[in-house]
Each structure stands twice: as C-alpha cells, then as structure tokens.
Amino acid sequence: ATSENPKKLGILASSIKITDTKVEYIEYKDDGAYFVEETISGNIITSDFYKISNGEKIHSSQIISSVSGKNVISRETDANGQVTTYSVKGIVSRDTNEKSIAPYAIRTDNYSISLVGKKVTIASAAMAITLVSNYIPTTGAEDIIKKAIVVVAGAVGAGVACLPDYLYVTSVLSMHKSVGKIYYVYDNDYYLDSNKSQLIGHWTFRHR
C-alpha cells in the first residue's frame, strides 16, 4: 500500500481482498489514501476507514450500514465523534418484460440498477443491489450480499476507478421438473454496459 495519491480518485482494484466475512481495499480520496475494512454480519455492515500516513494506518471514521425497507441506512461516525446518517439505494429502470417461446422459460426481465448515495462503499452498494434485484431475499441473506460484493468489486476493473453508476441485468425465470417435483431456477447476469457485452457476474438460485 502507498499513501501517494494518484491523479484519479477511487478504489485501487488490485487491492481488493474478499473473504467469507470481510472485504478490504484501498481508496484514494481528495486528501490521500485510505485503507477500508468492511465486515459483514447478517444484514449489518461495519465499514472502518484508516488514513494511510507514512506507512501507518490511522483510524479516521466508521460507517455502520443496515437495511430499512428497500434502502440501506448508513450511520457514519468521524474521528471527532460527529454522527451523520444517510441512505444508499439502488434505483431500478425496467426496460422490458417479455415471455420466452421456450416451454420451460416463464419470464425474461431486462433492467438497470443505478446506485445513489452520499458515500457508497463496495459492501453498501452490494447490499443495495440485493434489495432491488429480482428473486433475491432481502433478509438474512449474508451469502447473497457476499456474492453482490464480488459483482461490484469486479465492476471496478483494473487500476483505480470509482464504483459504476449503473449495472445492467438480464434475469431469467424458468421452471423445471425432477423426480416428479417442480422447481424454479432464477438466472441473473450482471453487465457494465447497456449492450451487455461486459459480463461481470452471474447469480443462480433454485427454489421449489
């Protein structure tokens, strides 16, 4: 890690590390480099920001994010103890909702998600995506949130970049039969562009 600030502000993609319970990365802001550590516990995300100075990490602020309806509510406490509360949310623009001619396919949805918020982190963006994506549980969905983090982290790309303003989604719902039982499969593909040439993530869910 370096404390030197590049010309471009945002997240250093090569610094992103994802484990079962955490996501860590370096983010460049106007006043320098920060090490960000986000811990996931159920539907609660704790984001700690450390200013990198002369090779040392100095804790500067903490954001605790949780779910409230379709929004992510973030409560930030800075080094002086001042508290600020704001929301992060995903806004869906639905393009089409068309039926497939294939007998097993029920529906194909195409839509985009725009991320809106004062300070959007990788983990809070991931949580916002789970709240507005079709067929994804919004409570007790720790594993889903982790998968969303991978999608958003993949969207950052090489070098230093900000989180994407939009994600474009194709979601297919299909019905299958196995051993006399019917189950449904939900396939979601996430893209960076409206032409859907840059695939960055895929989720599959099965439900009886």
Question: How would you describe each model-predicted region?
Answer:
Residues 1-113:
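N-terminal propeptides/leader regions of secreted preproproteins
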Residues 2-9, 133-145:
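Extended non-catalytic interaction/regulatory regions in multidomain proteins
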Residues 151-167:
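Transmembrane alpha-helical hairpins and terminal membrane-anchor modules
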